[in-house]
């Protein structure tokens, strides 16, 4: 069900969200992009990598970044991740628009990848073995957290983690 109306009564533009969406580009057979000749060398050099031996899918990632910016979605960066064919982008938003922008950024990612004949996999652990999975980290702050902060505020956040994590 749509909880937008209820959320709009609580969430304000003073609430800032930063999402870090990790994903793999995939070949039509489901294997990660760049793994066409089998399993690549161990992960490590791929993180924020450059060079054809270290990245696969950069053009798609950059096209996605540009499309989101043109659509008014505030992507603040993109980078190659720990495994070959794995990428991340960072999406910043305020209030309810943050969630909308995350969903639309994913939609644009899938559509642009389709134009290149590849898929997108956001599964948390798409490859078995000693390969990193993909997450979607969520960062949050409000005015108090960005300005004054306090030990009391920090402690209350830690207490909430016992219920929510």
Regions found by a protein language model. Give the residues of each.
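Glycine-rich, acidic/polar active-site loops that bind/position phosphate-bearing ligands
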Residues: 1-162
